[in-house]
Every structure is written in C-alpha cells, then in structure tokens.
Amino acid sequence: AYAGNAAVADNASVVATNPALMTEFKKAEFSVGGILVDADVDVAGTIGGVPANHKNVIPNAIVPNMYAVVPVTERFTLGGGLNVNYGLKSEYGNQYAAGVYGGRTELTALNFNLSGAYDLGYGFSAGFGLNAIHSDAEVERHLGIGGKAIARQLQAKATQAANAGQAAQAAQLNAVAGQLANMPSNTSVSKIKGDKWSLGWNAGLTYKLNENHRWGLAYHSAVNVKFKGEYSNQFPVAYNALLMRLAASGVSLPISQATGGENVPGSLTLNLPAYWEFSGFHKITDKLAVQYSYKYTEWKRLKSLTAYGNSGNTLFHKDEKFSNASRYALGFSYNANDALTLRAGVAYDKSASVNHPSISIPDTDRMWYSLGATYRFTPNLSADFGYSHLRGKKNSFKEGLSGQFKVTSKANLYGLNINYRF
C-alpha cells in the first residue's frame, strides 16, 4: 500500500520517492519492473431520461519503471530513474448517450529523473532531483443524445418566433433543429491532442535515529504543462455564423468554433499538482517492522481543462474543480528468513474530485489492501512481488442539467520488480 514510501530504502525506487534515501545504499543497485493495473469501473445513469450505462470505462494498463543508484563517495550518491508520474485514462464508446460528458480522456506523464543525495551527518541526509517530464494528452467528446436534445430547444424557439411573426427566424431555427436531430450520436464535438516536455524538481530529507528507526519527508514540485496541439470537431463551418445568434436566444451548442472536421491549432495548460509525503519506519524486533505514510497532494491547482485557439478564443472547456487530497497508509514487513521478506498494508485514498465528480474522470474515495514479498535469489539478485486490491466508494452525482450517474469502482494491481546489486 506504499506505506513508508519516504522512509524505506528497499530498492533503487527511492529515486522516485525520496532521493535522500539513496545514502542508505553502499553498493550500486539497478531496479526494473512494472505494475499491471486491472481496473473495473462501471457507470450507470441517465441523461435526458435516456439510459447512459457503460461498463469498464478504465482500460487496463502497464505502468513501467526503471531506477539506478550509484554511490560516488562515502557521503555522496547519484541516482536516476524513469517512471510514470501521473496517468489517467477513461474511454467511453463513441455512441455513448452522454458522450458530451464522457468520451476519451487520457493523460500520461513520463518522468525522467536525475538525483543526488548527501549524508549530512548526525543521522541526517538530504537529496535533490531534477525531472524532465514528457506529457501526452488527448480529450475527445461526442454528441450522444445532445443533437436531439438541442433540436427540441430550437423547435420551441422556432414556435415562439413564428408566433411573434418572425417567419424567417423561425424557418432558420427549424432548419438547424432538423440538422441537429439527424446528426449521428458519434459526431465529434471536440477533439484536442498534444504533447509537451516540462521541467520539475523534487527534494527529500531523512533522519535516522539508528538502524531501527528512520523518518523521511519528500516533496515533488508542481508542473505546468503547456500543450500545443490540434483541435477539431465535425460540425459544419457554416454553424460559426449561427453560434452567437443561438446563444442570444438561450440555446448553446456543445462547440464554440465549428471546424468541419479540419484541424486547427489549439493549446491547453494542465496544472499538475505538487505533493508532500511524510513517512516513518520502525524495526520492532529482529523480524518485524512497521512503516506508515501521510501524503498530501495539491490537486486544487487543477480547476478546469480549457483549450484555446490562436486568437484566444475558447475551443473546449470542462470544469474539474479538484480539491486537495490526503492519503494515509500503514504497513508491516516480516523477515521470514534470510531469503524471504513478507509484507502487508492498508491505505485510505481520498478522491480529489469529491466536490465536483465527473464521469470523464470517475474518481472516488478508495481503500487499498496490499500483500507483497521480496525474495533474494542471491546476495545481489532479488525480486519484489506485490498485489493490491482497491475498492472505491460508490458515488452518485449529477452532471450538467440532465445527467444523473452512479459510479462503482474496484481494481487489482499486480507489481513485479527485479533488483540487482553490483
């Protein structure tokens, strides 16, 4: 359950968790592995009275990692690593009824880290790292039942115009209503895709009272990712002349600029959060140890997903209104013999979207239940095995004017790392 992440120096992955822990290594070590994420997230609901159910909205994924730690002197250690800092993906079918809220949402932030650590003496060590982050993002939404719903609004406005003697306006509104009513549900209303390199940093501090007791504090900086990419939708460009007129009549289309399927330049700034983590490690007996962690992530920086055109016009906007979130973890490790260490832990993970849930990122509060083991084949070669079961809290909420949804979630994580000490 990642308990003790900032205070436990089991393998070279400390490069990513707390670089100050690298001073615990007296020999060079290399670690490579990954985690298979097998998620089961289902959405049940309605939009405008139409069923909007979707199963398995989070595809399975493999999350890789690779780290190395190299002592340079008795006090100074270098390290480097590759890992996924942030990753999320949800995918609904392109004919999903609530496609304007839940289509395809994907973000992957691949982190390349170079760190150094120094033993300050008196039990203290400090570490600092630089991060080069390559981020890929893609957001796509579809019309779903939106075309028919907007068509009904336009027909009502057309009737009002006709009754007021405005025959030309009524005819135009009815014509647009007919086009929208006949648009397929898989019509793309927005698609933006881009990638970007960004820079960040991380730092850590540890205090070791003795070989049996250690505390750690780690910090990872916020990163502002300024994507430049391409935006498109499948609405005819002739609609651009109607957008302001329709908005003035109280009817809004799910686009702010029609592109007719052509790509136009677009940009999107994604504010990834900073986080703090405090951890402790205590060896109670020769065989048994306890570790714990508190992690605070500043998700409040992520207020919305907004894409802009070259002239500053809004191409896509989605409120997220994330809140800062906390995570609590407690774990135990048991040295069964010289070759085998067993581990178990639990964690409570607070959702960042608890105050503004959305089916695009169907997050909920969740519990972690974890088991793991380290097996040492030789004094230099070992393998870490881990399994976690995540169970999310059921979450019912409204989205937009007519969407009502309930999200149920669980996941199984399977991890394997191979470690070699030189």
Show where each model-derived region lies.
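Glycine/alanine-rich phosphate-binding loops at beta-alpha junctions
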Residues: 43-44, 57
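N-terminal periplasmic accessory domains that precede
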Residues: 15-21
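Outer-membrane beta-barrel porins/channels
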Residues: 5-10, 48-52, 61-422
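A general structural signal for short secondary-structure junctions and capping/turn motifs
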Residues: 21-23, 68
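Residues immediately flanking
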Residues: 19, 34, 82
